[in-house]
């Protein structure tokens, strides 16, 4: 299964949201990225963007490229250096949020999923970019290096490139296991990702919601047999 979402509690104590699960075991995922400000970065995606760009740019460079005030960049830089109020995540949603902020579509989330939805809404045709993986980890830092290097190109093409990169990369890793692939999670409402997965023969949600509703349904289905035999709980 390819599971792409905004936030989920990982078995390692970190925040998951871009995972490949095979026979109940995590076999692959998106690159871990630092999230300065933890939950506040969900509301202000430029914080997430800073965390990613900080892998290959200085605070001064980030300020110019991302449109973040120099003083705020200094604070975020210190925060990351001291690991103060920072978390680590493999979330697909946070990647989409950061890309949406970089491309100028959304700098503040005023409702659930807004940055990612605007990224999708402003997407046209993806550009060609090489997938970068390492030990079943889809690297997202090179994706943002590409975006920065090509920032003057059509923003709608760059937006589509982000979503296509994640879809192709996650499918490539999952396909190694020679098993039927299921694509689900909150990001399985994303048209670009769904169309790619379906074109590759992956199964997607039809009768059960892909997001929180499907999660609740799955929990109920898992617990129902145990309710009949409380000794198993």
Regions found by a protein language model. Name each.
Residues 1-233:
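Acidic, glycine-enriched active-site microenvironments
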